[in-house]
Amino acid sequence: MGQEIADNRFSEEDFIAFSERLKRETVLLGEWLRDGAFPRSDHVGGFELEAWLVDEAAEPAPINDRCLEKINSPLVVPELAKFNLELNGHPVTLAGDALSCLANDLKRTWSSCNALADEHGARLAMIGILPTVTEDHLNPQNMSPLKRYKALDEQLFKLRGGKPLSMDIEGRERLSFVHEDVMLESATTSFQIHLKVDVDKAVRFYNAAKLLSAPMVALSANSPYLFGVDLWDETRIPLFEQAVYVGQSELTKRVTFGVRYLEHSIMELFEANCERYPVLLPRLMDEPEERFAHLRLHNGTIWRWNRPLVGFNDQGVPHLRIEHRVVPAGPTVDDCMANAAFYFGAVHALAAMEDPPEGHLPYEQARDNFYNAARLGLHAEVQWLDGRRGGLGVLCEELLYGLARQGLEALGIEPSEIERWLGIVERRLNSGQTGAVWQRGWVAAHGRDMRGLTEAYLERQASGRPVHEWGI
């Protein structure tokens, strides 16, 4: 969840003071990590789901303020655009029936929000990119009235020297256009999977999350169209990267897969934040250094596809989390939770291997795997740990599915839970029908009618049946 700021106007002194506090907090975090200030904990998982509000014409409905007034829940918060909401869940220890607990939590919140949206002639949609969104919807008038969003827009374009964004995405077709504000980011909605990790295992889990980014984005792909143009299976990836591009080097991209694996400590990421990334939101906060307020705010303006997070529980005890951001929203709650189950299991299995698997796949290949998977989905050809090259769908079926099962068993997830959630993944792999495949199939059968596609998608989403069961 984002942090609100008191003002969107900053002086040079604000940037200098913020940078000094950021440096001190970064040094302190390094000391805490070395000195054991982060206690060991159970494996805990959670999520954030970004959703669309959609009107009777199946177009974005900029009414999140009206819905939020009625919802009045800390679990539901605004997003960048007035037509988006963020739904959060209660974190749970990953054992027993944890996956069903997470799913039921999301279903309750989803149902409540949908009922309130209905009072305003709208409904919720979970999808990577809404097919009916147009560039006209992505304008500053539809920006949520929070100062952090206005400040983010101003500071990003200040880093760009005021130059507009030149967008160019080439997939099955090509889309090029120019845009003059940060609102393009709001067209990308995701299901972010959170995992609490111990400090001494953070490097292994982080590198495992990177290895899994290619299969996860292919398995969950749900964003083939932008402005009616057929692009990548998961067009959300290049769109988000280009939407906040500041025109600098690979080392300072604000949305990034990164430049290497971690070697010794999760601190390598926070040190990179401090050393390489210009401050965007220099809000000065009256907080003790031990709360890492400036470090956490700055980290929130760097959108790594796998992002480290520092958090605190209600008793003020610190913890580390890894936020896996590659998965799009939808198509249904059950699809989302099946994706989470696959990730939780596979990342634990990879991180527990005696021989670190990242040592068997060059970083550049892991990066190329990720972008190929986002472009081509389960049909992408990738290289895996044993040097073998092949289709991602085959890799998921023959190797990663078993690893995910092994990891969930080691966590103590109930056998019936494993069968339920990984069974959805297995049947999706067998059918080959991801959200992206279904959307393209519908268009092939019915024509490029984005409203018709969205209505058909929402009808099937409302059934609750996972996407592999959807008919065209």
Question: Where are the language model's segments positioned?
Answer:
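Phosphate/nucleotide-binding catalytic core
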Residues: 1-472
